[in-house]
């Protein structure tokens, strides 16, 4: 075994050669690198921001949002777009399903005039456009809706009934190999919305699976399972859904946490409702019977009245949000799309 000084000298020579050939900083000691905050894009629900552990969706990463039809997947993605735009960011939406509703997006707070939208004809075209936009370095967030709608060119040009086994999976695998490094370097968040399918002949365990092969499961830093758990009614009219999101994979914090929040029809995620739920859970808001109080001041009788009070008093809502984040140790940077909690990212 070589003496320690000889090994150190050999390592220094190798590092110098690598720096010369590939550029300074190609290899570095982890301790030399300053601890960088995990920059995030808030989701619009404080319950989900807390469940993610860092105050929102991490920037520079691949995110997969999947679930049954009409569960709220696109709503979650559009709220992230709205929050990124509010912080001065540029957003793009690759609408492979050709189903984006501009009016609904506007109701959620999306600046539709500034939103870049593409409605590609083939899966190759969709992913090539996404790759070029990300490589520009100008994007903050990009949504691909959905993976299931990324149909390979060969399938579109072929006949009905033709077999195209594995084409979409290979397409996704190649695209993610190309995009992942660029996303990290540019700090762009890529949200892939995905659908569920049933595996035939499964006797034990869940028969559910997502489309597009295994590549997205591997490359995604965060995977969110979105489910509608109950309908919200005003008398006999259904006015929204109670939604549960499970963080099934998380590379920036502890996984397997759950969040529940309300999605109101035509309005999106109820930020105030989420604040009330988490505030009561953390004893920041007090619930006595049907009354909700905060620091001795009554918010209202019943959740709807309390929600209305917070909507009309955004400064009180912001104060409650700040206290919740501080109590749970989630950084103040969760309030914008450029900062994050002062915690080093943890890779599992």
Swiss-Prot record:
Similarity comment text for this entry: Belongs to the RecA family.
HAMAP family xrefs: RecA
Lineage top rank: taxon: Bacteria
Record-level GO BP terms: DNA recombination; DNA repair; SOS response
Positions bound to ATP: 67-74
Keywords: ATP-binding, Cytoplasm, DNA damage, DNA recombination, DNA repair, DNA-binding, Nucleotide-binding, SOS response
Protein name: Protein RecA
GO cellular component: cytosol
Cited SUPFAM superfamilies: P-loop containing nucleoside triphosphate hydrolases, RecA protein, C-terminal domain
Stored InterPro entries: AAA+_ATPase, DNA_recomb/repair_RecA, DNA_recomb/repair_RecA_CS, P-loop_NTPase, RecA-like_C, RecA-like_N, RecA_ATP-bd, RecA_C_sf
Subcellular location: Cytoplasm
PROSITE patterns the UniProt entry points to: RECA_1 (PS00321), RECA_2 (PS50162), RECA_3 (PS50163)
Organism: Salinispora arenicola (strain CNS-205)
GO MF, one annotated term: ATP-dependent DNA damage sensor activity
UniProt entry tagged with the keyword Amino-acid biosynthesis: no
Signal peptide: none
Cited function: Can catalyze the hydrolysis of ATP in the presence of single-stranded DNA, the ATP-dependent uptake of single-stranded DNA by duplex DNA, and the ATP-dependent hybridization of homologous single-stranded DNAs. It interacts with LexA causing its activation and leading to its autocatalytic cleavage.
Pfam family, one: RecA
